[in-house]
Amino acid sequence: MALPRPGGSRLQLWWLMAAMGLCATLPANSGEIILDDVHIYYSAFPSRLIPPGVAAAHDLTRAENLMMINISIKQGDQPIEADISGDVTNILGQARTIRFVPIVEQDALYYLGEVIVDEKDWLRFDLTIDSDSMSEPYELQFERRFY
């Protein structure tokens, strides 16, 4: 899989990682799955946490009603490439497909997907993560309530 290599400064990378790391400290919005020596990290955070310059550098949208879903996969301390697909379903049963975009800078690799949310929205995520480093695709399911 060929990955885009967007430009950007180290400061932009720092802000993006800080925004993702901030949300990783919130137990209700993040998680980790361990499959042998492969670790899958996932989190959800408001797109407004991404500084405007970082969002522009990576063609990301910032909006009050937009959440970012962040997936990263590592084998040891090395990021690994993956194909990620999936859907999000709200409490009314309305489903939407999430398109994940790889973000690559230096030694970091993240996959970000955008999800529009309504106030006090409850969402179920059904994602498939596939990588040559994994013996089989992993079905990741989690639920989040957004305020």
Identify what each model region corresponds to.
Residues 143-147:
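Short beta-strand edge segments in extracellular beta-sheet folds
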Residues 30-68:
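Beta-strand-rich domain onsets/edges
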